[in-house]
């Protein structure tokens, strides 16, 4: 289902001019490249698909002193890619703060006994002190690894997530990794994800992907897992971090159409799933931004094709299932159609219930990796309209992909500052804003409903057909919550009769 609507291009262009007028000339010139309005849609491709132009600059270093909403390379590696691998211990190598303040913030669900065979929600740090900066921390790192192997013998590997001081003082974590891996006969992966590298968490994703290539795949080449037998319908689900159980909801659908998910990266993942990934027949990538690097490597090195899919909302679920099924042929295509038909009554019931309550409601999005585009059609499936969307750390190809989703006149903003985002929201007054925890409370103080689209506001899953029902319920609860009727003080709502005023 695709809604036919256009946004107010003139208003959105006026808003861009307004926010730029408040900057000094040099800053305004730089920020102008990051703000745009989606231009007219044109027909592209054999199926007549329409495409909007989202012409903004991206993946550029933020201006110092201007508050933006980005993270660092350490956040991209440890917090996104490696952290959810459940049977490995992930050391935050450096001062305690980075690990402490990022401890268990992402809702990466997993199955296992924490502290015994799974370690996702635990925080391990080398707790760098001043003397470690002066004399180096390699010996301390060796001691930390020894202690982990003694205290947690059921771990299947260790990653070393280096923080800023490690790169600045030049510690050789690679040498320590090789030494201790041989000594303990285990996998130890050094990740050079110091926070000062790159312009955002996006480089941390890339570095983490490279670490998988260099320290997992290359080490495993030539080795065969005799317990793992390949099949014709083996797939890897890559870039799904199981926020609120998303990966499990996606896996249900893929298995129902006849595929076997042999690895899920990296929500609820094990090291073994990562190691055997090159033996799958197809890589299905959900978060393109964070995991396209390793998919491209596997395509070049192991000839494994990859495709992007989207399980947000019934329109994209159906399109993705059919696209995936076409890769495997008539048998899987037939099963995919049966699965789509099976869930159609559920979809119809959800839409019948929530469409009257949500139709025409306007939404602004500002999130990370893929959600500023992937969730658009899920909102439209409920009759809602996207008036603005943007990314914290996107690259140019992300905005090219966004053109397939947005309508003409949509406000586009990259690496938005707090001032820009607040101004856009205050002037547009959407019915709902979907963004992160830092934006949640300022938006609610404006009297505008909000949903946290990084962690689903502690709800979920939002993937799959079951997830769509939860998604619709949550959007309805946010927008139609009676609390918004209490936002204005009673005395501001009161109207005093003219006659009464005259009598006084």
UniProtKB/Swiss-Prot annotation:
InterPro entries for the chain: Nase/OxRdtase_comp1, Nase_comp1_asu, Nase_comp1_CS, Nase_Mo-Fe_asu
What EC numbers are recorded for this enzyme?
A: 1.18.6.1
Question: Which amino acid positions bind [7Fe-Mo-9S-C-homocitryl] cluster, per UniProt?
Answer: 287, 454
Q: Name one GO cellular component term.
A: molybdenum-iron nitrogenase complex
- Gene Ontology biological process terms in this record: nitrogen fixation
Q: Which cofactor does it need?
A: [8Fe-7S] cluster; [7Fe-Mo-9S-C-homocitryl] cluster
Q: Keyword annotations for this protein?
A: ATP-binding, Iron, Iron-sulfur, Metal-binding, Molybdenum, Nitrogen fixation, Nucleotide-binding, Oxidoreductase, Plasmid
The protein's annotated catalytic reaction(s) are: N2 + 8 reduced [2Fe-2S]-[ferredoxin] + 16 ATP + 16 H2O = H2 + 8 oxidized [2Fe-2S]-[ferredoxin] + 2 NH4(+) + 16 ADP + 16 phosphate + 6 H(+)
Q: Kindly list the positions annotated as binding [8Fe-7S] cluster.
A: 72, 98, 164
Entry's Gene Ontology molecular function annotations: ATP binding; iron-sulfur cluster binding; metal ion binding; nitrogenase activity
Q: How is the cofactor bound?
A: Binds 1 [8Fe-7S] cluster per heterodimer. Binds 1 [7Fe-Mo-9S-C-homocitryl] cluster per subunit.
- Pfam families this protein is in? Oxidored_nitro
Similarity remark? Belongs to the NifD/NifK/NifE/NifN family.
Subunit: Tetramer of two alpha and two beta chains. Forms complex with the iron protein (nitrogenase component 2).
Q: What does this protein do?
A: This molybdenum-iron protein is part of the nitrogenase complex that catalyzes the key enzymatic reactions in nitrogen fixation.
What's the protein here called?
Nitrogenase molybdenum-iron protein alpha chain
Upper lineage is: Bacteria, Pseudomonadati, Pseudomonadota, Alphaproteobacteria, Hyphomicrobiales
Task: Report which gene this protein is encoded by.
Answer: nifD1
């Amino acid at each position: 289902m695709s809604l036919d609507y256009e946004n107010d291009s003139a208003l959105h262009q006026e808003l861009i001019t307004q926010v730029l007028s408040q900057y000094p000339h040099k800053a305004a010139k730089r920020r102008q490249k990051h703000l745009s309005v989606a231009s007219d849609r044109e027909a592209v491709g054999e199926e007549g698909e329409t495409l909007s132009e989202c012409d903004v600059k991206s993946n550029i270093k933020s201006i110092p002193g201007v508050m933006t909403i980005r993270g660092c390379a350490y956040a991209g590696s440890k917090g996104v890619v490696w952290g959810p691998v459940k049977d490995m211990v992930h050391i935050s190598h450096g001062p305690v703060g980075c690990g402490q303040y990022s401890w268990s913030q992402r809702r990466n669900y997993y199955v296992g006994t924490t502290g015994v065979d799974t370690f996702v929600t635990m925080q391990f740090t080398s707790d760098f002190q001043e003397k470690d900066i002066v004399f180096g921390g390699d010996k301390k790192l060796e001691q930390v690894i020894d202690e982990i192997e003694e205290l947690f013998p059921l771990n299947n590997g260790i990653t070393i997530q280096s923080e800023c001081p490690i790169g600045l003082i030049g510690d050789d974590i690679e040498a320590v990794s090789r030494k201790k891996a041989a000594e303990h006969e285990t996998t130890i992966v050094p990740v050079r994800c110091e926070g000062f590298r790159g312009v955002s968490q996006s480089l941390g994703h890339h570095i983490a992907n490279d670490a998988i290539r260099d320290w997992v795949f290359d080490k495993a080449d030539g080795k065969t897992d005799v317990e793992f037998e390949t099949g014709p319908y083996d797939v890897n689900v890559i870039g799904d971090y199981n926020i609120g159980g998303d990966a499990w909801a996606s896996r249900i659908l893929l298995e129902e159409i006849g595929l076997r998910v042999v690895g899920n990266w990296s929500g609820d993942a094990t090291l073994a799933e990562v190691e055997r990934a090159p033996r799958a027949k197809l890589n299905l990538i959900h978060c393109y931004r964070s995991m396209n690097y390793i998919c491209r490597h596997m395509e070049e090195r192991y000839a494994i094709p990859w495709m992007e899919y989207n399980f947000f909302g019934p329109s994209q679920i159906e399109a993705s299932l059919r696209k995936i099924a076409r890769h495997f042929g008539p048998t899987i295509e037939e099963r995919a159609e049966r699965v789509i038909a099976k869930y159609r009554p559920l979809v119809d019931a959800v839409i019948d219930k929530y469409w009257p309550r949500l139709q025409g409601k306007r939404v602004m999005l500002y999130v990370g990796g893929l959600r500023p585009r992937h969730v658009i059609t899920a909102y439209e499936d409920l009759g809602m309209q996207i008036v603005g969307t943007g990314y914290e750390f996107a690259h140019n190809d992300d905005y090219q992909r966004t053109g397939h989703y947005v309508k003409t006149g949509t406000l586009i903003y990259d690496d938005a500052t707090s001032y820009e985002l607040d101004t856009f929201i205050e002037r547009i007054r959407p019915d709902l804003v979907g963004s992160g925890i830092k934006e949640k409370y300022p938006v609610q103080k404006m009297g505008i409903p909000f949903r946290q689209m990084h962690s689903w506001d502690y709800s979920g899953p939002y993937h799959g057909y079951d997830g769509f029902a939860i998604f619709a319920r949550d959007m309805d609860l946010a927008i139609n919550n009676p609390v918004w009727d209490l936002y204005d003080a009673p005395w501001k709502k009161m109207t005093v009769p003219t006659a009464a005023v005259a009598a006084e």
